[in-house]
């Protein structure tokens, strides 16, 4: 038996256990001052990797001769050469307090090496860098960041790890609950983990579930899947950059495309980029404000229940009661632009092109601006949610321009005879951790203006609650009433609107 022990500050005694080691030596190479081992075979190697903190682990060595090395000393005339490392089955146990990983990985030879191009599907493509074959298969089980994790994968040969200029091939497919992460590609400078270039796929019940696996804070959504290229430059001392390029996928029934860059560092990591949906199903944005999305809603609810969230919409209430998770808003910053080009929605909600600039900094969230088309006109708003306040403080400044009255309620028959346009401005302030709470105690002002309009008399009678006149009009015919100008000024206090001017 060969046993490699741990440093004194590591609680476990053994780092590596080798029951048996076999090697061959090429004796003639000694004549040229070369120690040449054509192969070395390890029988059932067992390694235990432990990290207690960012700077304390059992795989970083400081050799005794390193500090006392003579700068003027001549290099040794002897050299060492190892051509191959073989083993039947290996086991790697990982106990990482930093990433909360407690994993057991079993490594088996594939029997016959698999070419990199065969596994990744890049056969026949020009490849300037030579990538080694896949030599070993992996099976993993355990927990990562406190979440259960299982998976399989493939990696290159052991000797490929030492080549600084040779990319090391990796492939894996992991699952945590209903969340799946699959990738294939290369690791650059694997001994120092200098970076990766991977084709990366995600799928699951909700984007919010990725927080536990990746540390990236994303909103709750309907079921999703994405496929893109991840290029990362890793520097554990300073800052690492993860660039998810040109991804395509879907959220619910909506397609998504874009690129996102996640940068670690102080005081908080940051997510930046652009995301676009060419055909956006408006209901798929529902979970962002606590509204069921329809398709996949049950999976989204299961995702919330798994995280211990209780989401019960009171009977007879329209405004969403789901709470915003403001306690997580300070884990990272964000600067992301989103566009929804073609909007799918019910005929009763005439919304078109949507765009917004999302800025999250130190738990302070701004949608600045939020724009979309509505009823032939446009809505522009600035939304500010102070997630660092308890309860959350919210403010909305909204401008509505050239909304066509006929298109505001296309399903209402009486509105089809209505002509004219509506303009308005609203300023609202409120507090609370849900849409219902924010609007339920909101204060502010609403101004509306209509000019050059034509309105159904019956509609005016209904609005005025004059039911008798409406019945007469319904029996003997309806007239149109021309409206040269109509204006309203409403003050809002504790969620109740009171008209100051209505003319």
Task: Write out the residue ranges for each language-model feature.
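Transmembrane beta-strand segments that form the barrel wall of outer-membrane beta-barrel proteins
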Residues: 90, 167-172, 241-248, 338-341, ...
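Short, highly charged
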Residues: 332, 337-378
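Hydrophobic residues on conserved beta-strands that form the core of alpha/beta folds
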Residues: 1-4, 18, 37, 42, ...
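Residues on the solvent-exposed faces and adjacent turns
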Residues: 6, 25-27, 44, 51, ...
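Secondary-structure transition motifs
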Residues: 2-129, 144, 271-331, 453-478
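Amphipathic hydrophobic-ligand
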Residues: 8-25, 37, 97-112, 145-156, ...
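Extended terminal
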Residues: 235-237, 242, 247-273, 288-291, ...
